[in-house]
């Protein structure tokens, strides 16, 4: 009997120890896409995020709390994305936060995450009005939204012309992926066209965008001063090749940051030279954090990229930067709710809302120069709005501007108006940020 009691006590202690160990894991669902026409972006981005998670774990976790995750393949499909979210949201103690990397999926999850009280990040994409945290408590378009990016693009074109006033009478084509993603910047582009007197010509491209003959015939007839390429996946090299075929100078083309990766330009060959795109993070392997990933993650055989030469590429570093952001949000939550403890989704939401990634902190993380400072608040879930521009010279993207912003006042006014309209439609009472802790 005594032996049985000792055995039972030992089993109880072992079970308690196992439970305690399990409680020290922070679960993050990963709604990824590694197949289909957008696989290059998904595999690079999510590969970078997972590489950073592995680096954090190799360094002991977040104050001892290890990260754990599970992937679900969405194929960049809205309905599959929602299915993946529902499948993973309650696993392993519940989701910390969700990042779909798809405007369509993000729209599909907008009401669900609010109901489930799980924060959703839309890092550099998604619905721009979610920057108003008074209305969108659970959504975080952290960094720079499409509206802010569109405003920065017009500011950059204004610089090229010698001033925004020089855009008056110009013609700018918005060549866009015919989806929620491609349509998202149109309200801001329309407002800026009205303000500065340029003509905006909107030309949609059907998914996936590997046929653009009719669109480039329209562009040739329109004779625009500039073409904004708001593309994704195979649409981008197709557009660059078509521009060369129809004699449109790539120096007059300006791409969204999802049209500004190596995978977008290399397939286009010489047709891509001189092409400029936006960026909200910088590529490269020289950053200390990237060197640590190479040594501690890839050196240990745990690297997520199948093609190791993609380390430091634009999509890879962008994914690393997202990993930094979500890890720092968890760390911030621990400061308030318990250092070394597993955070709930609601606690991580607070962390996302009180991020302060200063230049000094970014340097401490080994990422100085990779991305601009980010500081979020209850009212501002974006926290930056900065963009830099880069030009492809045939071998690599070279920065042509520092991080810069566009018409922030116009964008914020439109964010507030759009969020207020959404709140009225959904019968949401905006939060009083003065009462938030």
What are the residue ranges of the model-derived segments?
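Beta-alpha junction/loop-to-helix N-cap segments that form part of ligand/metal-binding clefts
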Residues: 24-27, 40-47, 54, 59-133, ...
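Short beta-strand segments enriched in small/hydrophobic residues
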Residues: 25-42, 101, 170-177
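Extracellular/periplasmic Venus flytrap/periplasmic-binding protein
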Residues: 79-80, 90, 128-129, 137-247, ...
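Extracellular/periplasmic periplasmic-binding protein-like sensory domains
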Residues: 243-323
